[in-house]
Amino acid sequence: MAVTSSSSSQPPAASQPGHFKRLWAYLRPELSSFILAMVAMGVVAATEGIIPKVVKDLLDQGFGGEYAGKLWRVPAMLVGIAVVRGVAQFGATYFLSLVSNKVLLNLRMKMFERLLQAPAAFYQRNTAASLINAVIFEVNQVLQVLTGVFITLVRDSMTVLALLIFLFYTNWRLTLVVAVILPVIGFLMSRINRRLRSLNREHQNLTNEAAYVVEEAAGGYKVVKLHGGEAYESRRFNAMTNRLRGYAMRMAVAGGLNQPVTQFLAALALSVILAIAMVQAQANQTTVGGFTGFVMAMLLLISPLKHLTDVNQPMQRGLTAAEFIFGLIDTPIEPQDGGKHIDRARGDLRFEHVTFRYGPDGRAALDSIDLHVKAGEIVALVGPSGSGKTTLVNLLPRFFEPTSGRIVLDGDALADLSLQDLRRQIAFVSQDVVLFNDTIAANVAYGARDASEIDMARVRRALEAAYLTDVVDNLPDGVDTNIGDNGSKLSGGQRQRLAIARAVYKDAPILILDEATSALDSESERQVQAALEALMQGRTTLVIAHRLSTIENADRIVVLEHGQIVEAGTHRELLDRDGLYAGLHRIQFATQ
């Protein structure tokens, strides 16, 4: 995958024609606007070739004979050319911007949709900063290719073509000298090209790493401040930005060679042309107007040639960004597998010989798990850190797929069920609360397509079950109050209870609780524990517990160690066995 925080991970090197071909697929629906932009740029280019022709005719014929009486046409033609050129330039910019912004929208939506469809392993491989960078920054790099760079390529290429036609028409011998120079320029540019693309790719990876450093420092600001980590974070970011500066300077050196090399070759060509023109003038093979028009066209040719050579560096940045973009778009989506639909499951779960490894060579996080959870049963999962509790519950909504074995819901393997239907059967409350920068009602009813689909009476009941009504009623806008980034306007306990209210609103037959009362004070914990116990009634519930006092009333407690089930039974049965659970219980209550 292209988007990664590791500088060692690079996107697959695809060919430039491959990138352009894929971009063309996004351009094709806007073909009419694209053609209008091309026509407008062609008009702009054509006006460049007319000006030297007017000057040539003026010098050769304008100071005598019949043409002298028509000199008023010259300023009129110049004004007319300026008007036509201005209108065409506006049209080209407008229509191409129209196309590029629609392409930008489609690319961003495609990338974001692919992010939403990516498997959980994708989010473990990539940092949030690198994904944000890809969707926001990298697409803008491609936008530069589609606007400024493309305008330069098309308009200035047409201008060069128009001027070359005039040059051949005026003096083909002198034009051949120019034609000799162009392949030399092209060869030099191709050599610089390869260097620029390599540097751009490394620069892109380092940019992702720098963004990740900022994300960590900003997200963990409390730890940074309490532990005096400001100097460490500053040194870390300084080291990263210095590496970025080094690559930026190498890119500047490689890109900076374009202009002086082009200008030197242009000056050399002009010197040779002047020498040949003087010889032709002595042999009456050229006129004053012809030579002046030729030199003028040559001078007009330098500017678009310069633009064409300068466009190389941003174009390479855009093509490198395209590698990242298409790398993300090509990310495999979650396997959908079977299409069997279920309305509401009973909640009977079976884990049959389930083994799971993180990576092909990793240690087994789960090893031959056999577990039957009856419909409506409350099963607590306990064990030391790293024993496999979280991994086990992550397999249920198919965030990950078992390495071997299978999980069965109501007699059907999870792989045979519609993934969307399966996840509708599961509500999840974690100690790591995730809330959205939206209203309280929208967070409780998360998943509703729009505000009109939210059942406000149901939201109210969910808030009551989570003991949040008093808090919400005291807010200025009630359930329509915006809670800020990840609920930043709420206290830790209020955030946890809002997550519980979301699970209550969903009313799923299967409930997963991962230390759901960990962030609550004693009073709130008693209230929410009572609400959770009511919520768990009639639902299949898996509870991950670190505080054993919260799961004493579970129907069954399953103890895991090193990815295996080592004990199972009720709280009293496990204490009587005096095994691992009893040991954990003694340690925990001794510290209390």
UniProtKB/Swiss-Prot annotation:
<feature type="transmembrane region" description="Helical">
    <location>
        <begin position="31"/>
        <end position="51"/>
    </location>
</feature>
<dbReference type="InterPro" id="IPR011527">
    <property type="entry name" value="ABC1_TM_dom"/>
</dbReference>
<dbReference type="InterPro" id="IPR003439">
    <property type="entry name" value="ABC_transporter-like_ATP-bd"/>
</dbReference>
<keyword id="KW-0997">Cell inner membrane</keyword>
<dbReference type="GO" id="GO:0034040">
    <property type="term" value="F:ATPase-coupled lipid transmembrane transporter activity"/>
</dbReference>
<keyword id="KW-0813">Transport</keyword>
<comment type="function">
    <text>Involved in lipopolysaccharide (LPS) biosynthesis. Translocates lipid A-core from the inner to the outer leaflet of the inner membrane. Transmembrane domains (TMD) form a pore in the inner membrane and the ATP-binding domain (NBD) is responsible for energy generation.</text>
</comment>
<keyword id="KW-1133">Transmembrane helix</keyword>
<dbReference type="GO" id="GO:0015421">
    <property type="term" value="F:ABC-type oligopeptide transporter activity"/>
</dbReference>
<protein>
    <recommendedName>
        <fullName>ATP-dependent lipid A-core flippase</fullName>
        <ecNumber>7.5.2.6</ecNumber>
    </recommendedName>
</protein>
<feature type="binding site">
    <location>
        <begin position="383"/>
        <end position="390"/>
    </location>
    <ligand>
        <name>ATP</name>
    </ligand>
</feature>
<feature type="domain" description="ABC transmembrane type-1">
    <location>
        <begin position="35"/>
        <end position="317"/>
    </location>
</feature>
<feature type="transmembrane region" description="Helical">
    <location>
        <begin position="261"/>
        <end position="281"/>
    </location>
</feature>
<dbReference type="GO" id="GO:0005886">
    <property type="term" value="C:plasma membrane"/>
</dbReference>
<dbReference type="InterPro" id="IPR011917">
    <property type="entry name" value="ABC_transpr_lipidA"/>
</dbReference>
<keyword id="KW-0067">ATP-binding</keyword>
<dbReference type="InterPro" id="IPR039421">
    <property type="entry name" value="Type_1_exporter"/>
</dbReference>
<comment type="similarity">
    <text>Belongs to the ABC transporter superfamily. Lipid exporter (TC 3.A.1.106) family.</text>
</comment>
<feature type="transmembrane region" description="Helical">
    <location>
        <begin position="288"/>
        <end position="308"/>
    </location>
</feature>
<feature type="domain" description="ABC transporter">
    <location>
        <begin position="349"/>
        <end position="587"/>
    </location>
</feature>
<dbReference type="GO" id="GO:0005524">
    <property type="term" value="F:ATP binding"/>
</dbReference>
<dbReference type="GO" id="GO:0016887">
    <property type="term" value="F:ATP hydrolysis activity"/>
</dbReference>
<keyword id="KW-1278">Translocase</keyword>
<keyword id="KW-0547">Nucleotide-binding</keyword>
<dbReference type="InterPro" id="IPR003593">
    <property type="entry name" value="AAA+_ATPase"/>
</dbReference>
<feature type="transmembrane region" description="Helical">
    <location>
        <begin position="134"/>
        <end position="154"/>
    </location>
</feature>
<feature type="transmembrane region" description="Helical">
    <location>
        <begin position="76"/>
        <end position="96"/>
    </location>
</feature>
<dbReference type="InterPro" id="IPR036640">
    <property type="entry name" value="ABC1_TM_sf"/>
</dbReference>
<keyword id="KW-0472">Membrane</keyword>
<keyword id="KW-0812">Transmembrane</keyword>
<dbReference type="Pfam" id="PF00005">
    <property type="entry name" value="ABC_tran"/>
</dbReference>
<feature type="transmembrane region" description="Helical">
    <location>
        <begin position="161"/>
        <end position="181"/>
    </location>
</feature>
<dbReference type="InterPro" id="IPR017871">
    <property type="entry name" value="ABC_transporter-like_CS"/>
</dbReference>
<keyword id="KW-0445">Lipid transport</keyword>
<comment type="subunit">
    <text>Homodimer.</text>
</comment>
<keyword id="KW-1003">Cell membrane</keyword>
<dbReference type="Pfam" id="PF00664">
    <property type="entry name" value="ABC_membrane"/>
</dbReference>
<dbReference type="InterPro" id="IPR027417">
    <property type="entry name" value="P-loop_NTPase"/>
</dbReference>
